[in-house]
């Protein structure tokens, strides 16, 4: 029997990918270039790493719908921040050319104020949502 994922997991995956694409579009519209997407270390993952001039931004992307226990900008726990910081340090050690860049941690959030049908493949951009870009959301 094939490994079947629950509908809500598939839905969350599609919403997450949509949010990452939207966040990247916003960043690129502001002059940032993608360095790497979904960078992994053994402790965590960073959704987007972008650069402009001598500035390097590690971006966490969050998307939430009505029924989630908190708004997107409220769900980044201190433990998650530590994992992102450690992963950023790993990135800088692996790619030393970026060590002289000014680095910061941003969060881009998407909140949908209503439930989204989980059984339908959605074009999330057609739905109403609030978007927030939190620069310097946390520091080392």
Swiss-Prot record:
GO terms for molecular function: nucleic acid binding. Coiled coil: none annotated. Transmembrane segments: none annotated. Pfam families: UPF0102. It comes from the Bacteria. InterPro entries: Restrct_endonuc-II-like (IPR011335), tRNA_endonuc-like_dom_sf (IPR011856), UPF0102_YraN-like (IPR003509). Belongs to the UPF0102 family. This is UPF0102 protein ACIAD1132. It comes from Acinetobacter baylyi (strain ATCC 33305 / BD413 / ADP1).
């Amino acid at each position: 029997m094939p490994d079947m994922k629950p509908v809500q997991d598939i839905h969350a995956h599609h919403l997450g990918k949509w949010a990452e694409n939207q966040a990247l579009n916003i960043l690129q519209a502001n002059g940032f270039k993608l360095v790497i997407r979904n960078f992994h270390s053994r402790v965590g993952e960073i959704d987007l790493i972008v650069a402009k001039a001598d500035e390097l931004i590690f971006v966490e992307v969050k998307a939430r719908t009505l029924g989630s226990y908190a708004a997107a900008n409220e769900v980044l726990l201190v433990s998650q921040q530590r994992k992102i910081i450690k992963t950023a340090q790993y990135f800088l050690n692996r790619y030393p050319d970026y060590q002289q860049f000014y680095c910061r941690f941003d969060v881009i959030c998407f909140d949908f104020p209503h439930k989204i049908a989980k059984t339908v493949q959605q074009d999330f951009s057609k739905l109403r949502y609030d978007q927030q870009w939190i620069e310097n959301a946390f520091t080392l």
